[in-house]
Amino acid sequence: MLLWILLLETSLCFAAGNVTGDVCKEKICSCNEIEGDLHVDCEKKGFTSLQRFTAPTSQFYHLFLHGNSLTRLFPNEFANFYNAVSLHMENNGLHEIVPGAFLGLQLVKRLHINNNKIKSFRKQTFLGLDDLEYLQADFNLLRDIDPGAFQDLNKLEVLILNDNLISTLPANVFQYVPITHLDLRGNRLKTLPYEEVLEQIPGIAEILLEDNPWDCTCDLLSLKEWLENIPKNALIGRVVCEAPTRLQGKDLNETTEQDLCPLKNRVDSSLPAPPAQEETFAPGPLPTPFKTNGQDEHATPGAVPNGGTKIPGNWQLKIKPTPPIATGSARNKPPVHGLPCPGGCSCDHIPGSGLKMNCNNRNVSSLADLKPKLSNVQELFLRDNKIHSIRKSHFVDYKNLILLDLGNNNIANIENNTFKNLLDLRWLYMDSNYLDTLSREKFAGLQNLEYLNVEYNAIQLILPGTFNAMPKLRILILNNNLLRSLPVDVFAGVSLSKLSLHNNYFMYLPVAGVLDQLTSIIQIDLHGNPWECSCTIVPFKQWAERLGSEVLMSDLKCETPVNFFRKDFMLLSNEEICPQLYARISPTLTSHSKNSTGLAETGTHSNSYLDTSRVSISVLVPGLLLVFVTSAFTVVGMLVFILRNRKRSKRRDANSSASEINSLQTVCDSSYWHNGPYNADGSHRVYDCGSHSLSD
């Protein structure tokens, strides 16, 4: 028996390859027992692969690998860690899991792969995780999920997929998976079908669906009915309509079947976001993103009726334009100016100006395919196509463009100076694409742009000076991206009136050099970010308080620390958020400012969070010292001045005596040369040199 054990251990070591040894015995990682469980902590060890390491074989353990560089997981990656019961792989930059990577982890019940860069779950991605009950994959770049991705997880109960880029769930994705808790917040879901999706999770006890762009049409009717039939407290949060316009901001549970699916013979009064796209392509005036006096109420996103109350959840800027439905008559219209319209597109005259060319949903893969090139096109719609990149050469013939819609394509690359020829462009839609970086060079030439929509991309970085190329920009839509910070002076030289930053990853925003440049802002949406309610957020809180609720859309909820989780930090006092700062204040000084909760706005990198009515010791002591030094220098200066004046006075007296002696000597000399006494004015003055001594 002993021989068999030795042979088994030898074969395992041989199969493992060049194993360096036990990560605990060789103290490569920190191994400690906590409440009877062994924790193998390999945080931030710089691991790029695990195939050369092993772990204790005599007991079960929790394996912590967060903060390493495990960017790819290959088959049998964890073959030497078969006693692990939980696996934590957060913040590894992980972007690919090769099927078979988890083979050998039959005992793992909890898998944490959140905060990485995973883009897809393929079939057999989780092969080997036979006992998995808990899967956390939030804050990734997840777009595609194979229908068979979870088919091997027959014990999975908790699935956390929030804050990804998921726009749809495939049929039968939950088949044979006993899901009880499902988190889909912060994705791109517009609808959830009942058949082959929702019907497969009958045991649901908790579901989260907030912060998705729900399209409240007939397709969402099945979701509404399903939510009404699950346990009363199963739905956590709200399902808020983002489209159509007439239902935007309304809770799904407050809608009726008639709201979601009006009769066909009734007119749907909702219109897409500015500029409106008419379904029949009838000639009409060029739409604008702002409502002016006399315009139709339905075509004014962001407008508030006179005397009405602005509803935070009904911010019209969130709406994405929807493609118009090209009717048969539109498709068969005669050629414009004797030239045929590009294949599959429809062209119309805009009264008093140029042409409107609609190529929405025409399977266009490149703008170079649009032939023949028409002159004087002012509105170009290319939404819902398959365009992957755009180049400067694509717009050489479109220098008169005023509106360009490239939304919902596959655009990941914008060549520098692509728009340099579009000097008259005022509206640019690039939402629902794959952009990850914005720079000044990409938007060079857009000197008249007023409206830019880049929501629902994968933007992680905005370079300094990006928006300086657009001095007339008024509306900027950046929501539902992957932004964690903004560069200094990002809004310098731009007079934004409306800004959307909701559903990103901001933990705080600096005031100095960023928010303080929004001097013309009238609407800003910041909800759905993981705010860290600590001392660093206090200047931002004060800035938000000055804006007021009529400018700041929606509430701002804390993500951390735990004691403030999901609390609106606008309702928290500064002392609650940053108690250690106020503990340093002199009791005497704080007694005079108990009612003050404002803080000095010095940016998030400063420790001066106190209101101007409060004076800390660190400010008071240097101030008093400065006064003392100034007074001392003043006294010394006065003494020096007095002493100098005295010396000058003595010098003048000495010079006066010397002058008299010289004068007397001159008189005596004069009498000598005249061989007798000198008489001044005859008998009035007589100097007898013989009777005076020069020493007198």
Swiss-Prot record:
Q: Which ranges make up the Extracellular topological domains here?
A: 18-622
Subcellular localization(s) per the UniProt record = Membrane; Secreted; Synapse
**What processes does the entry annotate via GO biological process terms?**
adult behavior; axonogenesis; endocytosis; gene expression; homeostatic process; multicellular organism growth; nervous system development; neuron projection extension
User: What does the record say about tissue specificity?
Assistant: In the adult, significant expression is detected only in the brain. Broadly expressed in embryonic brain with highest expression in subventricular zone, subplate, cortical plate, pyramidal cell layer of hippocampus, thalamus and hypothalamus where levels are highest in ventromedial hypothalamus and medial part of periaqueductal gray matter. Also expressed in mantle layer of spinal cord and in lateral and medial motor columns.
Q: Which residues lie on this side of the membrane: Cytoplasmic?
A: 644-696
> Which InterPro entries does this UniProt record tie to the protein?
Cys-rich_flank_reg_C (IPR000483), Leu-rich_rpt (IPR001611), Leu-rich_rpt_typical-subtyp (IPR003591), LRR_dom_sf (IPR032675)
**Cellular component terms (Gene Ontology):** extracellular region; GABA-ergic synapse; glutamatergic synapse; membrane; postsynaptic density membrane; synapse
Q: Where is this region: Disordered?
A: 268-317
Source domain of life: Eukaryota
Q: Which PROSITE patterns match?
A: LRR
Q: Where is the signal peptide?
A: 1-17
Which positions carry Phosphoserine? 695
Q: Where are the LRR repeats?
A: 59-80, 83-104, 106-128, 131-152, 155-176, 178-199, 376-397, 400-421, 424-445, 448-469, 472-493, 495-516
Domain called LRRNT: residue spans: 18-57, 332-373
- Show where the LRRCT domain sits: 212-263, 529-580
Query: Which terms are listed as keywords in the entry?
Result: Glycoprotein, Leucine-rich repeat, Membrane, Phosphoprotein, Repeat, Secreted, Signal, Synapse, Transmembrane, Transmembrane helix
Q: How does it sit in the membrane?
A: Single-pass type I membrane protein
After translation, the protein is modified as follows: Undergoes proteolytic cleavage that results in shedding of the ectodomain and cleavage of the C-terminal cytoplasmic tail. Glycosylated. Phosphorylation at Ser-695 is necessary for proper function in promoting neurite outgrowth.
UniProt similarity note: Belongs to the SLITRK family.
| Self-association and partners | Can form homodimers; homodimerization requires repeat LRR 2. Interacts with YWHAB, YWHAE, YWHAG, YWHAH, SFN, YWHAQ and YWHAZ.
Q: What role does this protein play?
A: It is involved in synaptogenesis and promotes excitatory synapse differentiation. Enhances neuronal dendrite outgrowth.
What is this protein called in UniProt?
A: SLIT and NTRK-like protein 1
